[in-house]
């Protein structure tokens, strides 16, 4: 019997990291924990393998790579990798999934539409690697229609052949033609504001604070660094908003209603320096962040989105959660750097004695 390769997010949990990738597994885990996550489904790494092995993709890739020679550590060879990436991605995206896979992907999308109560709902197709490498692969927003969902899943798969990913594999001595990932197909939130929050102050490592960053529109503006976000510092215990830094945001990442494309558009003058979040939203996000940290048992880096059409607080959604990495790593290094008295004694005992001659 073929291995299962597609799941509703609500079926998943942390234990499924290796099956569907960390992003999908964490979304499912948050659903199980009672957090508000947009409905969606996940294609597993097995789906990637099926696509690569049951279509001509792998055979064509290997043939192409036979003649490819470049040094990943030589900057002058970067153009070779860029050309290879472009050629390979075009190749991958031009080949359709096996017919039974495409049919199933579309059926799951139709069920999402039924749940939402309307046809052709917009979704995001998001990459989900078994190991968390934020920004390594690609995400596509506002994808509507079953055919477009199937096409954009292939685009996510093809992003494993973007230039930086190929170079990274070459440097590690890994096969260039193979890097299985999962894909999340997640219902889009019609975001009036979005961003990221940390259950530790990323500036100084203070674990008694939550830091929320946000901007108007979709969160990609904040995650990508294209907009300087507003920043809110909140005490975890008292829920007091201790600091507000409101930036001149300039633009927002939003849907163009005419072209149906996502784009940056200039904010009206009265919104550029206006806070993107209300106080009640800041406090609600802080409460949620604390619960996510408790649920996962470690400091968290969380992406949120606030709906323009749903009432508060039902419109506050989480679209990503992962362990905070910077201060957790520093804390680990600090602990590893401390030696016990017994360790110091053994170190002294086995230190070679220097003898002058």
What are these regions (language model features)?
Residues 1-181, 193, 273, 277-280, ...:
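N-terminal beta-alpha lobe that positions the nucleotide/phosphoryl donor
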Residues 209, 214-301, 306-310, 338-357:
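Conserved catalytic alpha/beta cores of large enzymes that bind or transform nucleotide phosphates
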Residues 48, 143, 209, 233, ...:
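Short, function-defining helix-loop hinge/capping sites that tune catalysis or transport
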Residues 220-224, 327-333:
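Cytochrome P450 core scaffold surrounding the K-helix E-X-X-R motif
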Residues 140-238:
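NTP-handling and nucleic-acid-processing catalytic cores
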Residues 131, 191, 218, 324-327:
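Short loop/turn segments at secondary-structure transitions that flank enzyme active sites
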Residues 214, 319-326:
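Short beta->alpha transition motifs characteristic of CBS
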């Amino acid at each position: 019997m073929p291995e299962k390769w597609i799941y509703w997010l609500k079926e998943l949990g942390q234990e499924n990291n290796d099956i569907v990738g960390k992003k999908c597994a964490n979304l499912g885990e948050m659903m199980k924990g009672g957090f508000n996550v947009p409905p969606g489904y996940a294609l597993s790494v097995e789906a990637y393998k099926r696509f690569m092995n049951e279509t001509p993709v792998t055979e064509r890739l290997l043939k192409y790579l036979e003649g490819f020679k470049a040094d990943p550590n030589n900057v002058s060879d970067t153009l070779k990798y860029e050309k290879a990436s472009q050629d390979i991605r075009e190749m991958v995206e031009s080949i359709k999934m096996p017919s039974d896979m495409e049919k199933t992907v579309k059926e799951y999308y139709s069920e999402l539409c039924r749940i939402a109560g309307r046809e052709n709902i917009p979704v995001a197709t998001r990459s989900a690697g078994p190991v968390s490498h934020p920004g390594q692969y690609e995400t596509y927003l506002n994808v509507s229609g079953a055919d477009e969902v199937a096409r954009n899943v292939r685009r996510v798969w093809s992003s494993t052949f973007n230039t930086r990913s190929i170079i990274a594999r070459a440097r590690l001595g890994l096969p260039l033609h193979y890097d299985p990932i999962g894909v999340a197909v997640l219902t889009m939130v019609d975001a009036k504001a979005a961003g990221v929050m940390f259950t530790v102050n990323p500036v100084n490592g203070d674990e008694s604070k939550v830091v929320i960053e946000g901007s108007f529109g979709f969160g990609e503006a904040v995650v990508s660094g294209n907009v300087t976000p507003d920043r809110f510092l909140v005490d975890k215990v008292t829920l007091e908003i201790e600091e507000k830094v409101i930036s001149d945001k300039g633009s927002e990442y939003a849907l163009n209603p005419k072209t149906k494309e996502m784009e940056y558009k200039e904010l009206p003058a009265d919104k550029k320096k206006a806070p993107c979040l209300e106080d009640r939203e800041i406090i609600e996000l802080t409460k949620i962040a604390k619960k996510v940290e408790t649920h996962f048992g470690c400091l968290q880096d969380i992406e949120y989105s606030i709906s323009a059409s749903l009432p508060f607080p039902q419109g506050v959604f989480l679209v990503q959660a992962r362990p905070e990495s910077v201060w957790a790593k520093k804390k680990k290094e600090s602990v590893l750097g401390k030696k016990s008295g017994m360790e110091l004694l053994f170190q002294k005992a086995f230190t070679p004695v220097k003898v002058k001659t």
